[in-house]
């Protein structure tokens, strides 16, 4: 019996990207469509027995999925009655059909040679299994990575839905472009093999970008270079490196001593996608706005992190996972070359914290809707020599929520997107743990970091209206009317709750995965007294442009593996 699975590329239906798995089942080769076994007499079951017997009972052997009582329900109408040879075959078919209807496609019932004089029919259940996974092409990704993830989802007996889920989860992997598979019979009854042809995505990507996502006080514009790999050592590990050049206005790029970079590495540890994540971020800045530029204020911030991420539950629509992260941050501020405390909580210009963060995540996907939510519980630790003033508790607690709802609202791929950001703490926290409101990623129309508070709430609904599509119907240009609302307050101290909100329009252009352009203009409904209000952000303009490419396709066909 042969079943073929053909995987298609991710597609956008109603404007929402979904991962679709198409299944085409072929009639078993060498067997009639009805799947009738040879006559019972040829199997030696009947011998010299009469053409009909009184069926007093049925005994099952080898069944683990369904109980004897459940299988007897399928044939109870024939018990106590005279049955012919053909009707015995009908009993076998009914049991086999029950397995197939429940997606156990290589399981079924077998009637072996036996004595029916006592009226007891013995049926042997063959519960099929997946014996081998043959990767029929060779790429940079190790074939064991793929085999383990198939066997992770597929148990014994083999269920077609479990196999489809395993293939779907593999195809969602960012390293995989598409897969083609065929389920073929093995050498033994109930045994099946899975043949796979896996097309990997290109392994490396590189690019450049420019944006104005920094506070104008330190130079809003920045240029960046980025490099990444989806499979560094063929173990499925990823590496992302980003280097940023700060920019003073639009006039001069600072290639001096500034060190602004980030490095993130992740490595899957088990077939259950337990993943180790390591991170390093370095950020330097200098105050450039008058009159504070004369003070020569500089800051150096560094962050180290180590995390374990574990998916707990996954199916075609739902995914729930938990991340446990340890993070260490340190910051130093210099004024005219000397350490100086500017932000609350710092000691002699230095702040140092260590935190444990627990982050449950949930994702729901359907053709019309995507919902994603993450909540992070952060616990300050009195470890690795934390530095802060005595009025700040080293063992602090914060609770942050990030959520988004994407809904297809029209047939022309118009999307409604609602974003929610939230942070709560019952005590004052140092500035590196506070929440920033204002800027491209929170409240458009205001400066980046317009407000910095202990607690905050941001709600941002927007429509994404496609105004230009390619010849395949994929939206390339979206027009985005939006409304942003945010409020923030400190747990203690003089700054009361403050609310800002804006409305505006944006345009995005995404012709490929590695070309992304976005421009937003937002009207701020609240004015702030800013001495130097000549930055683009002061006019409500935010922009971002990233251009890159990927390279090195490692896939080539090698044929079946023994």
Task: Describe the residue ranges of each PLM region.
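Outer membrane beta-barrel transmembrane domains
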Residues: 287-289, 325, 329-346, 355, ...
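Residues that define the transmembrane beta-barrel architecture of outer-membrane proteins
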Residues: 190, 219-223, 257-261, 300-304, ...
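Transmembrane beta-strand segments of outer-membrane beta-barrel domains in Gram-negative
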Residues: 205, 268, 273-429, 559-562
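Extracellular loop and loop/strand-boundary signature of outer-membrane beta-barrel proteins
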Residues: 155, 212-213, 246-251, 290-296, ...
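Periplasmic polypeptide-binding modules associated with outer-membrane biogenesis and secretion
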Residues: 33-214, 220, 226, 242-259, ...
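Transmembrane beta-barrel strands of outer-membrane/channel proteins
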Residues: 183, 208-212, 225, 239-245, ...
């Amino acid at each position: 019996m042969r079943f073929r699975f053909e995987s298609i590329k991710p597609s956008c239906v109603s404007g929402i990207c979904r991962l679709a798995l198409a299944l085409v089942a072929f009639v078993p080769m060498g067997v009639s469509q009805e799947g009738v076994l040879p006559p019972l007499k040829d199997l030696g079951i009947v011998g010299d027995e009469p053409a009909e017997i009184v069926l007093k009972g049925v005994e099952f052997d080898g069944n683990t999925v369904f109980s004897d009582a459940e299988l007897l329900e399928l044939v109870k109408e024939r018990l106590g009655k005279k049955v012919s040879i053909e009707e015995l075959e009908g009993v076998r078919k009914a049991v086999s059909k029950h397995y197939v209807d429940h997606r156990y496609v290589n399981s079924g019932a077998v009637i072996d040679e036996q004595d029916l004089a006592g009226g007891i029919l013995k049926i042997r259940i063959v519960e099929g299994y997946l014996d081998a996974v043959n990767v029929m092409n060779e790429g940079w990704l190790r074939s064991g990575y793929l085999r383990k993830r198939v066997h992770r989802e597929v148990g014994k007996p083999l269920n077609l839905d479990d196999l489809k889920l395993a293939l779907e989860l593999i195809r969602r992997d960012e390293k995989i472009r598409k897969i083609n598979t065929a389920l073929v019979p093995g050498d033994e009854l109930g045994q099946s093999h899975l043949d796979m042809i896996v097309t990997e995505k290109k392994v490396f990507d590189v690019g450049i970008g420019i944006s104005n996502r920094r506070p104008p006080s330190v130079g809003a514009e920045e240029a960046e270079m980025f490099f990444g790999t989806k499979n560094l050592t063929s173990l499925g590990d990823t590496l992302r490196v980003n280097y940023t050049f700060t920019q003073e206005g639009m006039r001069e790029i600072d290639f001096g001593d500034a060190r602004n970079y980030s490095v993130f590495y992740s490595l899957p540890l088990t077939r259950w996608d337990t993943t180790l994540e390591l991170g390093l971020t370095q950020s330097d800045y200098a105050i450039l706005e008058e009159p504070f530029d004369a003070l020569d204020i500089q800051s150096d911030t560094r962050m180290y992190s180590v995390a374990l991420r574990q998916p707990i539950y996954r199916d075609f629509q739902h995914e729930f996972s938990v991340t446990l992260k340890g993070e260490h941050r340190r910051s130093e501020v210099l004024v005219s070359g000397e350490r100086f405390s500017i932000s609350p909580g710092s000691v002699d210009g230095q702040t140092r914290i260590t935190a444990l963060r627990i982050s449950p995540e949930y994702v729901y996907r359907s053709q019309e809707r995507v919902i994603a939510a993450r909540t992070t519980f952060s616990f300050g630790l009195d470890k690795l020599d934390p530095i802060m003033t005595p009025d700040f508790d080293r063992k602090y607690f914060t609770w942050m929520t990030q959520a988004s709802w994407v809904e297809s609202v029209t047939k022309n791929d118009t999307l409604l997107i609602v974003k929610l950001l939230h942070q709560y703490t019952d005590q004052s926290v140092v500035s590196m743990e506070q929440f920033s409101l204002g800027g491209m990623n929170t409240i458009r129309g205001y400066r980046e970091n317009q407000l910095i508070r202990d607690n905050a709430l941001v709600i941002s609904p927007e429509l994404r209206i496609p105004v230009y599509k390619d010849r395949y119907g994929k939206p390339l240009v979206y027009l985005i009317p939006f409304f942003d609302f945010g409020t923030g307050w400190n747990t203690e101290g003089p700054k009361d709750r403050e609310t800002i909100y804006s409305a505006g329009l944006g345009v995005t252009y995404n012709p490929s995965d590695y070309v992304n352009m976005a421009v937003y203009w937002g009207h701020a409904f609240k004015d702030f007294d800013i001495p130097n209000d000549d930055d683009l952000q002061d006019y409500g303009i935010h922009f971002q442009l990233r251009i890159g490419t990927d390279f090195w396709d490692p896939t080539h066909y090698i044929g079946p593996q023994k």
